[in-house]
Amino acid sequence: MKRTPLFEKHVELGAKMVDFAGWEMPLYYTSIFEEVMAVRKSVGMFDVSHMGEFLVKGPEAVSFIDFLITNNFSSLPDGKALYSVMCNENGGIIDDLVVYKVSPDEALMVVNAANIEKDFNWIKSHSKNFNVEVSNISDTTALIAFQGPRAQEALQELVEDSLEEIAYYSFKKSIVAGVEAIVSRTGYTGEDGFELMIEAKNSPKVWDALMNLLRKIDGRPAGLGARDVCRLEATYLLYGQDMDENTNPFEVGLSWVVKLDKDFVGKEALLKAKEKVERKLVALELSGKRIARKGYEVSKNGERVGEITSGNFSPTLGKSIALALVSKSVKIGDQLGVVFPGGKLVEALVVKKPFYRGSVRREV
């Protein structure tokens, strides 16, 4: 299994390590519950260095990325980041990603850990007609997420530039704990917070400095368990569970990242798909505390209407919650049933998304 440059730090902290997409990653340090609560009330710090980073440089960097992704990258100012998906020619989602516009001829793409090789090959295969150079810098790049309502006040102590001046989905090159870093106001938890992109060799030093901050504010290092709970509570999608190459953006509530007034890979397929959307992703609150797993059948009045894509117990809400891909006829307020192993039917209410709205800044 692969290890991030912060692996030894996790071991020192006594983390429970697990295999995630071929990476040995911390599931939790003390408990998922405590780590979720730290994110919601103070700060949780995540090692997300398993994520992939690609550098795109060249005079046609912007137009190239605009061709690859569904969202509009060409109109983005320097210093801003953008959430989007990449689709194949059939309109299926290859990956969801965040793209950073550094300058008119330089951009950074951050992709999911499980898709690094697939994405890089896909991107390279489409680069031949553009004057660009694409580099996979994942192995030399570390990424640390510092997330929670107290993230700004705590982190400011270590950052040379004003964090207040970094707007939501914006970033700045700065110095953090004496180390060069890209500091972005982005995250995957539903809270305000920052992600720090640094050279892998410098990451242990930055991690230690951040740990010292956490001790002052009752913050905690947090593992992938808490990350999954937080993202589900905030109703952020997880690639490979809530979406994949067999789903299109319209089915999973991502129509807002599809800009059909420009050209991109998969546009023709998505123009057709938009006219005949038969499924949608809905939020469910289940009775009791049992956790619905991916693939569990979802029924309405005894008839199958879809299946669970993600499920977990929400410590913040004190409820079992899930996302499900179901028939478009299902609506908020409907009572559905989730079929658990052994045939037990658990009641589930379709609720408005998101389950939880935290301190994340909404202005873009």
UniProtKB/Swiss-Prot annotation:
Pfam families: GCV_T, GCV_T_C. Keywords: Aminotransferase, Transferase. Its EC number is 2.1.2.10. GO terms for cellular component: cytosol; glycine cleavage complex. It catalyses: N(6)-[(R)-S(8)-aminomethyldihydrolipoyl]-L-lysyl-[protein] + (6S)-5,6,7,8-tetrahydrofolate = N(6)-[(R)-dihydrolipoyl]-L-lysyl-[protein] + (6R)-5,10-methylene-5,6,7,8-tetrahydrofolate + NH4(+). Gene3D superfamilies: Aminomethyltransferase beta-barrel domains, Aminomethyltransferase fragment, Probable tRNA modification gtpase trme, domain 1. GO terms for molecular function: aminomethyltransferase activity; transaminase activity. It is an enzyme of class 2 (transferase). InterPro entries: GCS_T, GCS_T_bac, GCST_C, GCV_T_N, GcvT/YgfZ/DmdA, GcvT/YgfZ_C, TrmE/GcvT_dom1. GO terms for biological process: glycine decarboxylation via glycine cleavage system. It comes from the Bacteria. Belongs to the GcvT family. PANTHER family: AMINOMETHYLTRANSFERASE, AMINOMETHYLTRANSFERASE, MITOCHONDRIAL. The glycine cleavage system catalyzes the degradation of glycine. The glycine cleavage system is composed of four proteins: P, T, L and H. This is Aminomethyltransferase. The lineage of its organism: Bacteria, Thermotogati, Thermotogota, Thermotogae, Thermotogales.
